């Protein structure tokens, strides 16, 4: 065994006895100081390091580790991504569980497709509005408290919506669901960008968005299958109960913020933050990208049920609900492409994912069901990949007021859902699926042009963003 190393400190006269190997001693010094100094000539293997480590070095190391980023492969990383996975699951399950029941609502309340789409659009509109408030609130109060409160409130409002018989009351509860969910949607991306090591942010964001995809799929799938056997009221209660379970898991396992620093809620400060983001060369384009991508995605899933329930397909509500399994492609693509973007760069990846969306949607314009379903799958794969890349780009691009930047991105994202989702109903009534097709293709071409514009964007100093 190697002999213990000892050396008398030049500064304090104390003797530090090192009982570890020389390698351990060197690693300790590196941890304390970040790197080896090249300014002091090294005359021996021990002397320079003994001079650099003061008696309080251990305290400094502990303080530094306390503020460190969460690294991939650590238990903290697994807890974080699992918690945000559950949060994303609950958010999208609560938000999009109403899509399969839109045809049933049209029949029960004697309303057309555009009016029925309000049950989703009112939620996403209130969510978009809430994003402008909850993001800055989290900058002051902290990330985790806002997200936990948001999930529990949204789950309870969903349960309440299943107990109300009138259309206006249902819309009111759905508005409360959207407003509540803004607390998680606005903050989750910011939490990840603050706590996860920058080298792994793409993977972490991809896993969070995978939770979104599973939530959206599960909400649609459970609702679509259940309403063939029970009332949509009962199905809504089941969705709300599952969301309560997910909210509890989220609350228990999400680590507290370690790198959060509270900032002012002064209106002038908030306005300065918004102005700063819109003056950035890239962020406004990312906000527009979110609007176009989400508008196209929600429009397809809002009205595909109307097409497949009618002639010549005449599919049952349960079978249409099962088509939500195409979300599995999004679960894979969000994590895989997010990690790929970390390696190859977001400029190279974003536009390619939109081309995939276009290719998938073109397949849905044909009549055979065996082309429609693969088209939906490819379209979904491309959408979640694009969203993963664009959303992780926000955290890298915004140098200050990251919560506000995330809020503006998601405001645009859900504004696209509300506006395009309802506007699609008019195209459906004007031209059927071909009318929907022209609308979605226009949105995707716009998204592709924005992505190509972003590909030419000059990166920030010392960042690939």
Predicted features and spans:
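Juxtamembrane intracellular "pre-TM" segments in multi-pass secondary transporters
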Residues: 69-74, 255-287
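Helix-breaking motifs and short loop linkers at transmembrane-helix boundaries and internal kinks
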Residues: 110, 142, 163-169, 366-367
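Conserved MFS/SLC helix-loop-helix module at the cytosolic interface between two early adjacent transmembrane helices
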Residues: 129-165
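Helix-loop-helix hairpin linking two adjacent transmembrane segments in secondary transporters
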Residues: 169, 207-252
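Cytoplasmic helix-loop-helix junction between adjacent transmembrane helices
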Residues: 173-211
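C-terminal membrane-cytosol helix-exit motif in multi-pass small-molecule transporters
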Residues: 241-260, 450-454
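C-terminal transmembrane helical hairpin of 12-TM major facilitator-type secondary transporters
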Residues: 347-390
């Amino acid at each position: 065994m190697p002999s213990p190393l000892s050396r008398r400190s030049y500064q304090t006269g104390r003797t530090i006895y090192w009982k570890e190997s020389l390698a351990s001693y060197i690693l300790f010094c590196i941890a304390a100081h970040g790197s080896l100094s090249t300014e002091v000539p090294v005359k021996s293997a021990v002397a320079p390091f003994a001079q650099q480590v003061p008696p309080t070095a251990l305290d400094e190391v502990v303080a530094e580790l306390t503020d460190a980023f969460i690294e991939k492969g650590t238990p903290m990383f697994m807890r974080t991504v699992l918690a945000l996975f559950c949060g994303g699951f609950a958010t999208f399950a609560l938000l999009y569980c109403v899509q399969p029941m839109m045809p049933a609502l049209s029949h029960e309340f004697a309303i057309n497709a555009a009016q029925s789409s309000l049950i989703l659009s009112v939620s996403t509109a209130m969510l978009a509005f809430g994003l402008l408030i909850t993001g800055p609130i989290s900058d002051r109060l902290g990330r985790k408290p806002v997200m936990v409160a948001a999930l529990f409130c949204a789950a309870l409002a969903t349960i309440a919506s299943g107990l109300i018989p009138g259309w206006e009351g249902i819309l009111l509860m759905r508005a409360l669901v959207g407003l509540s969910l803004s607390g998680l949607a606005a903050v989750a991306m910011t939490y990840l960008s603050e706590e996860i090591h920058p080298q792994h942010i793409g993977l972490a964001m991809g896993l969070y968005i995978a939770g979104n995809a599973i939530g959206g799929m599960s909400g649609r799938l459970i609702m679509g299958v259940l309403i063939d056997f029970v009332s949509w009221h009962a199905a809504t209660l089941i969705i709300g109960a599952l969301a309560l379970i997910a909210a509890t898991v989220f609350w228990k396992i999400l680590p507290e913020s370690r790198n959060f620093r509270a900032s002012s809620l002064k209106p002038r400060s908030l306005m300065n933050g918004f102005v700063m983001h819109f003056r950035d060369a890239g962020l406004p384009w990312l906000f527009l990208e979110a609007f176009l991508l989400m508008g196209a995605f929600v429009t397809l899933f809002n009205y595909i049920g109307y097409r497949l329930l009618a002639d010549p397909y005449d599919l049952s509500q349960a079978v249409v609900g099962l088509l939500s399994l195409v979300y599995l492609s999004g679960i894979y693509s969000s994590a895989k492409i997010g990690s790929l973007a970390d390696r190859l760069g977001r400029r190279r990846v974003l536009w390619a994912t939109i081309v995939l969306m276009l290719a998938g949607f073109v397949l849905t314009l044909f009549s055979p069901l065996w082309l429609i379903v693969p088209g939906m799958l490819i379209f979904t794969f491309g959408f979640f990949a694009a969203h993963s890349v664009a959303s992780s780009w926000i955290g890298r691009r915004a140098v200050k007021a990251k919560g506000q930047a995330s809020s503006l991105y998601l405001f645009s994202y859900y504004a696209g859902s509300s506006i395009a989702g309802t506007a699609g109903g008019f195209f459906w009534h004007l031209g059927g699926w071909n009318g929907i097709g022209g609308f979605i293709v226009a949105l995707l071409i716009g998204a592709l042009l924005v992505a190509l514009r972003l590909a030419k964007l000059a990166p920030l100093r010392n960042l690939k963003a």
